[in-house]
């Protein structure tokens, strides 16, 4: 069984508490310069939490999100993440593509599941 703790993109007390309570971390990273730059600080924070507060904490992998492979920029960012972190941390081959449907679902408080093989979206109401 898995319990997902979805944290805000900050390194505040709530995120630290979530890391202390977790066994593993899945790191979603938006395919853009600033989120990738913040990834380094997050990895340092995870390392600090592991060293001082939660020795069993591991990084499950990095998942690229909001990827628009029509642009060279997104390809460059994805490549940079793989080159920089790929030897130390698993980088998922599948990505979450840039989609207005995802933004609309978030604004409406809905949960979404991307089924990559079928290239369709399955929408679920948030409970």
Feature roles, as predicted:
Residues 98-104:
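Short, glycine-rich, amphipathic interfacial segments at transmembrane boundaries or analogous
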Residues 10, 101, 120:
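Residue-level recognition of oxygen-bearing side chains
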Residues 105-126:
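C-terminal boundary of histidine-terminating zinc-finger modules
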